[in-house]
Curated annotation (Swiss-Prot):
Keywords: Cytoplasm, Developmental protein, Homeobox, Nucleus, Proto-oncogene, Repressor, Transcription, Transcription regulation. The keyword Plastid does not apply. Atypical homeodomain protein which does not bind DNA and is required to modulate cardiac growth and development. Acts via its interaction with SRF, thereby modulating the expression of SRF-dependent cardiac-specific genes and cardiac development. Prevents SRF-dependent transcription either by inhibiting SRF binding to DNA or by recruiting histone deacetylase (HDAC) proteins that prevent transcription by SRF. Overexpression causes cardiac hypertrophy. May act as a tumor suppressor. InterPro entries: HD, Homeodomain-like_sf, HOPX. One of its GO terms (biological process) is positive regulation of gap junction assembly. The keyword Cytoplasm applies. It comes from Homo sapiens (Human). This is Homeodomain-only protein. The gene is HOPX. Interacts with serum response factor (SRF). Component of a large complex containing histone deacetylases such as HDAC2. Interacts with the acetylated forms of HSPA1A and HSPA1B. Interacts with HSPA8. PROSITE patterns: HOMEOBOX_2 (PS50071). Residues 3-62 bind DNA. PANTHER family: HOMEODOMAIN-ONLY PROTEIN. One of its GO terms (molecular function) is histone deacetylase regulator activity.
Length: 73
């Protein structure tokens, strides 16, 4: 059975995405997003979707509304 499913990235891809989310930028610009997508072997759309969902998860864990952009909003 393959590690990759139709519904999401592989473990290796998630590791790359998580590293960039935690160490590089939670709000990557389009150029950075393109570079992360290339590094992970995903499309820009898949990468953008992953970051959007991961950011909402992070906000919830921090007790913030999932739609706000920062602590000051």
């Amino acid at each position: 059975m393959s590690a990759e499913t139709a519904s999401g990235p592989t473990e290796d891809q998630v590791e790359i995405l998580e590293y960039n989310f935690n160490k590089v930028d939670k709000h990557p610009d389009s150029t950075t997003l393109c570079l992360i997508a290339a590094e992970a072997g995903l499309s820009e759309e898949e990468t953008q979707k992953w970051f959007k969902q991961r950011l909402a998860k992070w906000r919830r864990s921090e007790g913030l509304p999932s739609e706000c952009r920062s602590v000051t909003d």
